[in-house]
């Protein structure tokens, strides 16, 4: 046929059988990738430390999506929360991966069958004998079926009526587990961080889809609308489908980057805004203050801070710290977290407590500045020692650790104090193993960052695809160079004055 690569889809333009075939093959490829990727991730995933080496630190991409839908067990005998199990059941991580691969194989065979047997009676218009599709009817069928699936997911899977529920956690990502969720029918259901909204919105959207599907199955579009929107043209279907996909991609890019109940931090890692706003730092200080109010010592109060909460308050877990072109997991960047060293408290020789100013998200380097409780600079690590007034040596800064592995240990040696001041810029101080994976010390993004970048990029690309194909189908006659009134203009007797549409003759 000699088609250039960008014109190859014309082979399925007037061939419904093979149009169906290539879509089934596409589904086979998507399902096959999902299953294969899941098996690869399971082969490299280390479930031994869900607190300091969770799935998002290891760069897992499909495991978090399975987990948020209720899969927590592996045929390898482990549970995602760190426990061991004896009977994982069919729907384990491996079971879901295998189901996708089997489904992919069946779709592959179905695609071949439909490619070979393309000329089916169902695709022929009985009036003309030519291949044709009743697109408004097909639209109604798809709307109805997707509505049923949407309603079923919200009413059965999410609520636990017939299914496991979904991953639900507290606001600080500490107590997450799979559990049934009751639909939230009040105004709280519109809060993106309320899991009940997931159930209620799927039930509502599914109901709407079912009703809309039945409407489109029982009511034919008006002729003027049918012609105006080119409802008989398959490229109209392509254009509107692309619109649905790019809109969904923009939405999920937003819910992933800014966070929501659908993207728990235990599965995808924290958001950059939680670092920017000191979200975890505030909660840690609140807990310490509450402990002190109960007559606990500083050491006791800090020792009760969960290691998981402290780890969230570390800049290396901020998805905006990784460059777009730095490949690999977070563990390949700053290393595998081994343990929390504790919270460093700095004091000058007068005994005044000093706080290290934290590094903002978009800085790679940042001056080490220590301020007092009023925000006044009291110490720093100077760039030029000759002009320094507030150096650690001059001010006599010491550091003492509370909680963690170095609980109760203090240092007054300036070199050690400066080392921990630099590390305190990055949040809570952790021991990181960079040898095991030959980590290079350069921060990487989490799957939250990759997902957002990928979906925002493809959404933009698909937006232009929607405009392109929409314009092609709406202005098909213009692009083809054929004026639809051309025959009327040259037809003898169509107009009182030849070629003048304002003098059109009335039919007798």
From Swiss-Prot:
Alphabetical GO CC annotations of the entry are:
chloroplast thylakoid membrane; photosystem II
Primary location group: plastid
Q: Which organism is it from?
A: Nasturtium officinale
Q: Which Pfam families match?
A: PSII
Membrane-spanning intervals of the chain: 21-36, 101-115, 140-156, 203-218, 237-252, 457-472
The UniProt entry's sequence similarity note says: Belongs to the PsbB/PsbC family. PsbB subfamily.
Q: How does it assemble?
A: PSII is composed of 1 copy each of membrane proteins PsbA, PsbB, PsbC, PsbD, PsbE, PsbF, PsbH, PsbI, PsbJ, PsbK, PsbL, PsbM, PsbT, PsbX, PsbY, PsbZ, Psb30/Ycf12, at least 3 peripheral proteins of the oxygen-evolving complex and a large number of cofactors. It forms dimeric complexes.
Q: What note does UniProt attach to the cofactor annotation?
A: Binds multiple chlorophylls. PSII binds additional chlorophylls, carotenoids and specific lipids.
Q: Which domain of life is it from?
A: Eukaryota
The annotated topology with respect to the bilayer is: Multi-pass membrane protein
Q: Subcellular localization, per the record?
A: Plastid, Chloroplast thylakoid membrane
Keywords, alphabetical: Chlorophyll, Chloroplast, Chromophore, Membrane, Photosynthesis, Photosystem II, Plastid, Thylakoid, Transmembrane, Transmembrane helix
**Is Chloroplast given among the entry's keywords?**
yes
Please explain the role this protein plays, according to its UniProt record: One of the components of the core complex of photosystem II (PSII). It binds chlorophyll and helps catalyze the primary light-induced photochemical processes of PSII. PSII is a light-driven water:plastoquinone oxidoreductase, using light energy to abstract electrons from H(2)O, generating O(2) and a proton gradient subsequently used for ATP formation.
What's the name of the protein? Photosystem II CP47 reaction center protein
Q: Which GO terms describe its biological process?
A: photosynthetic electron transport in photosystem II
What terms describe the molecular function in GO for this protein?
Answer: chlorophyll binding; electron transporter, transferring electrons within the cyclic electron transport pathway of photosynthesis activity
Asked if the Swiss-Prot or TrEMBL record annotates the protein with the keyword Repeat, the reply is: no
């Amino acid at each position: 046929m000699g088609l250039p690569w960008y014109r190859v889809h014309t082979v399925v333009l007037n061939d419904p059988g093979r149009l169906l075939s290539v879509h089934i093959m596409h589904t086979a490829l998507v399902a096959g990738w999902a299953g294969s990727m899941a098996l690869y991730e399971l082969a490299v995933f280390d479930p031994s430390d869900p607190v300091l080496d969770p799935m998002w630190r290891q760069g897992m991409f499909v495991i978090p999506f399975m987990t948020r839908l209720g899969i927590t067990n592996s045929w390898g005998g482990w549970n995602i929360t760190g426990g061991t199990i004896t009977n994982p059941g069919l729907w384990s991580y491996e079971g879901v991966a295998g189901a996708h691969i089997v489904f992919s194989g069946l779709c592959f065979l179905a695609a071949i069958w439909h490619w070979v047997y393309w000329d089916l009676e169902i695709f022929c218009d009985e009036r003309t004998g030519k291949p044709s599709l009743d697109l408004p009817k097909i639209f109604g069928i798809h709307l109805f079926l997707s509505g049923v699936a949407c309603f079923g997911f919200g009413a059965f899977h999410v609520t636990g009526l017939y299914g496991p529920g979904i991953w639900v956690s507290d606001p600080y990502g500490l107590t997450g587990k799979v559990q049934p969720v009751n639909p939230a029918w009040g105004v709280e259901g519109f809060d993106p961080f309320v899991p009940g909204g997931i159930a209620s919105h799927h039930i509502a959207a599914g109901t709407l889809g079912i009703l809309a599907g039945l409407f489109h199955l029982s009511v034919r579009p008006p002729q003027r609308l049918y012609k105006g929107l080119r409802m008989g043209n398959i490229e109209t279907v392509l254009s509107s489908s692309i619109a649905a996909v790019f809109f969904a991609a923009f939405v999920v890019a937003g819910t992933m980057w800014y966070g929501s109940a659908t993207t728990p931090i235990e599965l995808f890692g924290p958001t950059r805004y939680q670092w920017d706003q000191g979200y975890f730092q505030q909660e840690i200080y609140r807990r310490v203050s509450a402990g002190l109010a109960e007559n606990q010592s500083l050491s006791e109060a800090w020792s009760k801070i969960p290691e998981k909460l402290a780890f969230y308050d570390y800049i290396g877990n901020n998805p905006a710290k990784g460059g777009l072109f730095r490949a690999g997991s977070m563990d390949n960047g700053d290393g595998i977290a081994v343990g929390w060293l504790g919270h460093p408290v700095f004091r000058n020789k007068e005994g005044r407590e000093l706080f290290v100013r934290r590094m903002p998200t978009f800085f790679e380097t940042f001056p080490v500045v220590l301020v007092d409780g009023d925000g006044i600079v009291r110490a720093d690590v100077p760039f030029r020692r000759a002009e320094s007034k507030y150096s650690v040596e001059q001010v006599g800064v010491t550091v003492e650790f509370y909680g963690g592995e170095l609980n109760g240990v203090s240092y007054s040696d300036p070199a050690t104090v400066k080392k921990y001041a630099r590390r305190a810029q990055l949040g809570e101080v952790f021991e990181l193993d960079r040898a095991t994976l030959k980590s290079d010390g350069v921060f990487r993004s989490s799957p939250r960052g990759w997902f957002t970048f990928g979906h925002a990029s493809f959404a933009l690309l698909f937006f232009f695809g929607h405009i392109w194909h929409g314009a092609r189908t709406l202005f098909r006659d213009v692009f083809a160079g054929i004026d639809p009134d051309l025959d009327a203009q040259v037809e003898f007797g169509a107009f009182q004055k030849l070629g003048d549409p304002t003098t059109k003759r009335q039919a007798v």
